[in-house]
Amino acid sequence: MSVREKMLEILEGIDIRFQEPLHSYSYTKVGGEADYLVFPRNRFELARVVKFANQENIPWMVLGNASNIIVRDGGIRGFVILCDKLNNVSVDGYTIEAEAGANLIETTRIALRHSLTGFEFACGIPGSVGGAVFMNAGAYGGEIAHILQSCKVLTKDGEIETLSAKDLAFGYRHSAIQESGAVVLSVKFALAPGTHQVIKQEMDRLTHLRELKQPLEYPSCGSVFKRPVGHFAGQLISEAGLKGYRIGGVEVSEKHAGFMINVADGTAKDYEDLIQSVIEKVKEHSGITLEREVRILGESK
């Protein structure tokens, strides 16, 4: 029995797509094929896929909403698991529990509807709840670490564990999940009671700032670089004269130099080449070495 036949038998009922192009699932609109793209409907299907992959020695990875990643043009070998169907969100008092595939922006709107404050900073951050925990996503002075109460994960060995914020060892755009290989299943956020109008005004203000400053009208991977201590990446790139700098179909945004946008059928290689070139030119200009925030996954073509 071939691996494919065994997969279809053991994982019967689970949505699996073979040699599926990933560009249509990525905010950058680039990326090659996944060998097996899987859409589990719940944590039990997810656990079945992980167990099968481990037994068959097939590599696997989970993607959130693919908002802060670049998938290389050669694609990704093994299983790519998209958890967007694991998207239930519930409210209990001042606590919101969200599954990993829940949309982060929509989760902040649920907090607003229940007049819960603390989540406003994330009202414009694209991506999933699971991805936000993985990266300790943040903006405008807030970050996931500030509001996370606990996190349920599936370990790489297939066990379910509940972790505290301390267990996750949050840092700037970092969590312990990045090293552990665990998969976020669900998250509990501890919020506080607030006034609906005040929360909405703050969310509207932050949304306006984002629309004003960021090139939301183009495909992009979000913030490309981490913020250097004492500096802003976008400012350093701008001061190096790189706004509008382009390689292939990808260019440094004129609107915000911290973003690289796909303006003309760019490729993942265009992104990688532009990122490396910007790092080198900023280093030459300011002496500061930018560190990449965006994750680059898969194989080159």
Curated annotation (Swiss-Prot):
EC number in record: 1.3.1.98
Family indicated by similarity: Belongs to the MurB family.
Lineage start: Bacteria, Bacillati, Bacillota, Bacilli, Lactobacillales
The protein's required cofactors: FAD
Swiss-Prot/TrEMBL catalytic activity: UDP-N-acetyl-alpha-D-muramate + NADP(+) = UDP-N-acetyl-3-O-(1-carboxyvinyl)-alpha-D-glucosamine + NADPH + H(+)
Domain FAD-binding PCMH-type: 30-194
GO CC annotation: cytosol
GO biological process: cell division; cell wall organization; peptidoglycan biosynthetic process; regulation of cell shape
Molecular function per GO: FAD binding; UDP-N-acetylmuramate dehydrogenase activity
Functional note: Cell wall formation.
Keyword check for Cell division: yes
Keywords, comma-separated and alphabetical: Cell cycle, Cell division, Cell shape, Cell wall biogenesis/degradation, Cytoplasm, FAD, Flavoprotein, NADP, Oxidoreductase, Peptidoglycan synthesis
Pathway recorded for this protein: Cell wall biogenesis; peptidoglycan biosynthesis
Stored PROSITE patterns: FAD_PCMH
Organism: Streptococcus pneumoniae (strain 70585)
Active site (UniProt): 173, 223, 293
Subcellular location: Cytoplasm
Main location: cytoplasm
Highest rank taxon of the organism: Bacteria
Protein name, entry field: UDP-N-acetylenolpyruvoylglucosamine reductase
PANTHER family: UDP-N-ACETYLENOLPYRUVOYLGLUCOSAMINE REDUCTASE (PTHR21071:SF4)
InterPro entries reported for this sequence: FAD-bd_PCMH (IPR016166), FAD-bd_PCMH-like_sf (IPR036318), FAD-bd_PCMH_sub1 (IPR016167), FAD-bd_PCMH_sub2 (IPR016169), MurB (IPR003170), MurB_C (IPR011601), MurB_C_sf (IPR036635), Oxid_FAD_bind_N (IPR006094)
